[in-house]
Structure formats: C-alpha cells, structure tokens
Amino acid sequence: AWAIQRYSHDTDVPTARERYGELVAQLIDFIIDGKHPNLQVDDNGLVRTDGTRQPMSWMDSARPDGTPLIPRTGYLVEFNALWYNALMFLLQMYADDKQMQSRVERWQKISDAYAESFAPTFLNDYGYLYDYVNGSYTDLSVRPNMVIAVGVDHTPLDRRQRKRILDFITRELLTPKGLRTLSPNSYGYNPWYVGNPEQREKAYYSGSARPWLMGFYCHAYVKVFGIGGLSFVNRMMIGFEDEMSQGAIGTLSELYDGNPPFIGRGAVSFAANVGEILRVLRLLKNLDV
C-alpha cells in the first residue's frame, strides 16, 4: 500500500485508484477478515503479530534453529504505522465512492479506533515510541522503526509529538551514513559488523547504520520543520554523495558501522539504500533546494 501511495504522488490519486486501488483494498480486507496467518486486527484498530517462533519484521536475524535473535512480537511500531497509513490512503481513494460505502465505513471505524489507541499504546514519557508492545510488556529499546511512524503521510500523532520523537531519533540514532539500528544508550549496542557469521548475525541489528531509513527520516524532518528543515536535509545528502565515490562507485553499501569512521559493510551495493536516498534527493529537487 505504501508503494502504491508513493506511485500516486508521481501520478495522481485517481490514476493509482484505477490501476491498483482494488488490489490494495483486497489486501487490507484480507487482514481485517483474519485470513492472514500472522496478522490480527484488534478492537482498538492496532495490528498484532506473533514473532516468537520466527522473525516477522525486517529485523530478521535468526538463530540456527530459525528462532529470532530479536523476538519482536505483539504490536510492532512500524507495522502499525504502515497499517494506519494504508487505511487512510484507502479512505482517500474511496471516500466518495457510493458503491464502496460499506467497505469505507468499515475502514473508517478501524482507523478511528486506531487513532485513539496508537499514542496511548506506543508513546512513552521519555519522548519516543516503544519498539513493540506485547500485553503489559513495553520494549524500551531505542530503535529506528519509530521513524516510519513519523515519516509516512498519515499518522495520528500531532506535530508536537512528532517533533519530540524526531528530536530523540536525531540525538540517539542519526549518523552521517543513516540511522543506527539501536541506540548507543540501549542494552546490547554493538556498532561493528565484523567477525565470523554468527558474530555478524548478532551485530546486524545491534547498532549498524542503515541509509534507507533516511528516506522516512528526511520526509519526517521536512514535514515537522517545513522549509526551515531543508538545509539540514541537504547537508545530510552531501555526505552520501561523498560516499558514492568510495568502494563500489556510484552506489551505497548494505550497512555501515554505527561509530566513526562509519565503514561500509555487507553487500557492496544495496538497492533499498540507493532508492531511498534518491527519494530524498527528489524531494529536495521538487522543493527547489
């Protein structure tokens, strides 16, 4: 749904609806109807998943038996951010379609419940979002998944809340090569993706920096700070231009050490990183920076 929404920005909403709207609607209804094997929509509008037996998110490091090294389960912050954004995009496409009225009312009811539940569930007194919430357990690890909740088009968080979260991300996770997968102040931080395969697997999401997360970060920054934030975003992009003259020329590595000198690791070229940096550069171009 997020990809189709991005397509609508490059075309228009009616075109996206005509070509892909029903597909997005069917996917959302599939989840609402409880047909997805590992996603469940609760009465509060939030979507829940079971990540105890196998990794369910992009943070998919696993032990030899397949169980996750980072067992994120329950309400995952990025799953829920993308879920609400998808619901609101559907409503944007079909709000005035009388033939879709019953489905629209259903989506609206869930999105309304979600809007009331998200902040009380995820927002903590420290000013950032829990990485996941499972029953009474709230995960305090400072991870970058919360940037998706402030970087998508639709969020129930107000500007003050988004600014506070973004300030926290900037302070704890931002590096010249992307956002760290874990804050240096969180337990288990390891910025070095080195060693044997087992050591690297454990370090994969424990502090390394990911350029692709800058897509959500920079869009969130511009949404919160407006034109005043563009010079900061532009300065961040200059660092990536320099990086593209290192290693594999014209591209970006899979990940980078979370501490200086931020050495590139993993695959020498990673499409998601290149794509999201290009998305930010396009944002700057469209805003004439």
List the model feature ranges, each with a label:
Residues 32-48, 75, 82-193, 235, ...:
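Catalytic cores of carbohydrate-active enzymes
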